Amino acid sequence: MTDTLIPQALQDAVADAAGADHTVSIAYSGGLDSRFLAFVSKFLGYRVRLLHVAGPHMAPSETAQAVADARAMGIEPELIMANPLGITDLASAGKNRCYVCKHHVFMELLARTTDKKLCDGTNKDDLSVYRPGRKALAELGIYSPLAKAGFGKKEIRATAAKLEMPRPDQAARPCLLTRFPYGVMPDEATLKLTAAAEDWLEAQPECAHLRFRLRFPDPARPYHAELHVEEKSLEGLSKATVDAVAERLKARFAPDLNDLTVRVMVKLSGFYDRAN
């Protein structure tokens, strides 16, 4: 049964990740990729160790969901507190922001897995797009079983559905620092605002299938926020409906989001990479 549900390439890649004690150690964000890797490793009979980094750059709701998902798999995740805002050269790193942050965070994780191979959820698709954080992973010897097995998002979702893993259609919600331009270092209060506002949006019935990001794109206007909505996720929703939700958002988080506009865009990810 296992052979038919999980391709041999992925079985082999996970086996390569396991130590002598059959433990697979995973840097676990709680996103689809690392959650799938944990699920498959558990399904294949390995002991799974999950290391989850929590801090102001992560929405508290994301950490809570990551913990709940891990426990649903029968795994108690290890929570590691980290604050990227304390990295002195992060703001000056420019487009290498993710590299600097990941290098710092994964050094923390490696200190806790000195006798283990540390894995992450990088997938095949990540290899063909701009991902400066991958350089840090390569330098630190982080192992990516999904990428090695040739698994991209399509294969991950399809296999997750076959294995009856909950929420195989889970959408990405990257680090909150990505809501700000390169070179801008937000404070904790603004990160909390961003997380709370996005949580509020996700809870609105109209936003059930909406893909969006709340971004602060203009350093000269620190209180100007833009709600970026992916065009294909509108699924029959009119721009007027989205504007009405945005007005409720402004009222809920007044005065912090009084200067909020809505932008519908073809591609949601990589906004600041396209802008530079």
Feature names for model-found ranges:
Residues M1-K162, E247-L257, V264-N276:
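ATP-dependent adenylation/nucleotidyltransferase module used to activate substrates
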Residues G19, L201-R211, A251-D259:
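Short secondary-structure junctions
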Residues F151-R213:
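Mid-to-C-terminal catalytic subdomains of enzymes
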Residues A172-V184, A220-H224, K267-F271:
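Flexible glycine/acidic-rich beta-alpha junction loops that bind and position SAM and/or redox cofactors
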Residues M185-L191, S233-V242, F271-N276:
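Short glycine/threonine-rich loop-to-helix capping motif typified by GTGT followed
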Residues A197, S238-A251:
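Short amphipathic alpha-helices in soluble, non-transmembrane regions
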Residues E206-H209, F216-P217, R221, D243-E247:
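Anaerobic metallocofactor- and corrinoid-dependent redox/one-carbon enzyme cores
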Residues D218-S233:
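Short, aliphatic-rich beta-strand segments
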